[in-house]
Amino acid sequence: MRRIVAGLGALAVIAPALLAPVAAFAGPTCTTEAKDKWMSQDAMKAKVAEMGYQKIKTFKVSGSCYEIYGYTKDNKKAEVYFNPVTGAVVKSEID
């Protein structure tokens, strides 16, 4: 019986360490507003184009964000998260 208890104790120590990397891959929190307050996807796509992003390969809802994969006006790869209410950039990764 001791081995089972010791095994469960070890699991309690290891489990949080295994789950921590999952949180690292989660996207940012862009808004807490309800979706009926969000800009339409068409309006956001227009704003993204006005900001100079082009060749958008992916435009999607990601958690509480609009997320794009495309290119900057300087032709650099971009992954960008936007606040869907204001259109502001919340997080960007430019290569």
Name every feature range the model reports, one short phrase each:
Residues V61-Y69:
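Surface-exposed aromatic
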Residues A26-T32:
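Acidic/histidine-rich, surface-exposed loop or edge segments in extracytoplasmic proteins
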Residues V48, I68-Y69, G87:
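Conserved histidines in hydrophobic membrane contexts and catalytic metal-binding motifs
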Residues K73-N75:
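Glycine-centered tight beta-turn/hairpin loop motif at sheet-sheet or coil-to-beta transitions
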Residues M1-F25:
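Classic N-terminal secretory signal peptides
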Residues I94-D95:
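Short, solvent-exposed mixed-charge patches
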Residues A78-V90:
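A short, surface-exposed beta-strand/turn
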Residues T32-K55:
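Short, non-transmembrane alpha-helical segments in secretory-pathway proteins
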